[in-house]
Amino acid sequence: MVLATIRMMMSAKKFGEALRILRSMAEQSRVQPGCLSSEIYRNGQEDNVLMLEQLWSNEEDLERHLRSDEYRQVLLVLEMAIKQPEIRFDTILSSTGIETIEKARKDNGRRERA
């Protein structure tokens, strides 16, 4: 899996337009092959900061998305940013859920009794 994250700061004047464009693109991305999730987040502590987070099943699907017409919308928003956007692509080799918390808590209980 590949986690693609873009954090960008927009001017107050361009924030609404950027949010509208990214929401539309995220919606289109969700139906593309290999897209596991596509979400837009607003930073609660910093005004005018947006984050696009997408999870792709593999690098090939992500690369196809990066070449798509829909992704041109993201490039447009990146050009609107008032600071250099932070862009990351993280490869995830494995993923777990609640079982990791349960195991850690169970293992901790054993250590406390020893």
For the regions a language model picked out, list residue spans one by one.
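Short, well-ordered beta-strand segments in beta-rich or mixed alpha/beta enzyme
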Residues: 2-8, 39-66
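Short, surface-exposed ligand-recognition loops at beta-strand->loop->(often short) alpha-helix junctions
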Residues: 9-19
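Non-catalytic surface loops within mature trypsin-like serine protease
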Residues: 10-12, 58, 91-94
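An amphipathic, aromatic/His-enriched active-site/gating alpha helix that lines ligand/cofactor pockets
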Residues: 24, 30-37, 55-89
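Glycine-rich beta-strand-turn "strand-cap" elements at beta-sheet edges
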Residues: 40-46, 76-114
